[in-house]
């Protein structure tokens, strides 16, 4: 799925992320909380969630808090990342990506900053893989770095585990979800204001049309049965 060996970064992943994002917000959990909060606003009643490309499982505690009754599965190709995720989230379930069968269907497949690590030529194939595991009426919700934001570009260019990154814009993500047979029902730009301007963050949802946010999200919904 990616040319970067995330096994070598699993132990130090959290500290590396903190170093990269400290200038934006010293509370590194803010980025994870933000995505899960936005996910919950898009799909408030999900009963089963796949954290696709879960890495070391940083989103899992926030997903569990937002969806206390849901079945939540984390999946990733990195064995070391999954081992770390299991250690820090011992009550949750993690499955290697190559063992993720199509017999289980999910209401939500959540992919947070995963697809820029996937080579462009296999992105459609990867979305088809996800689509096969989506329940009728379910959603694939993708968060990605916004290539139109120069600060985002700089952060990606200086991040050691983004060496393979090929950023994809919101339009590309939406088009690929459509090719996978999904209807785009929600999308927007996000993460506009750093911690120093946190008082302005309530304005974010009014600005989601503006292509200057540090990241963006796109939700593709499958037809109901």
Where are these regions (language model features)?
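Conserved class I S-adenosyl-L-methionine
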Residues: 1-43, 46-55
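Class I SAM-dependent methyltransferase SAM/SAH-binding core
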Residues: 58-99
């Amino acid at each position: 799925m990616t040319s970067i060996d995330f096994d070598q970064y699993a132990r130090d992943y959290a500290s590396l992320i903190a170093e990269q994002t400290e200038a934006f917000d010293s509370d590194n959990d803010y980025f994870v909380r933000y995505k899960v909060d936005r996910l919950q606003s898009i799909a408030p009643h999900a009963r089963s969630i796949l954290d696709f490309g879960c890495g070391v499982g940083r989103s899992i505690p926030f997903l569990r808090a937002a969806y206390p009754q849901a079945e939540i599965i984390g999946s990733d190709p990195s064995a070391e990342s999954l081992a770390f995720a299991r250690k820090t989230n011992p009550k949750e379930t993690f499955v290697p990506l190559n063992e993720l069968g199509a017999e289980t269907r999910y209401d939500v497949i959540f992919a947070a900053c995963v697809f820029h690590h996937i080579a462009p030529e296999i992105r459609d194939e990867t979305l088809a893989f996800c689509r096969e595991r989506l329940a009728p009426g379910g959603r694939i919700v993708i968060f990605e770095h916004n290539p139109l934001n120069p600060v985002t570009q700089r952060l990606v260019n200086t991040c050691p585990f983004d060496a393979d990154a090929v950023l994809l814009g919101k339009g590309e993500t939406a088009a690929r979800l459509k090719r996978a047979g999904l209807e785009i029902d929600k999308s927007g730009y996000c993460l506009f204001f750093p911690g120093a301007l946190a008082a302005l963050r309530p304005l974010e949802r009014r600005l989601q049309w503006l292509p200057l946010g540090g990241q963006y999200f796109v939700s593709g919904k499958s037809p109901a049965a």
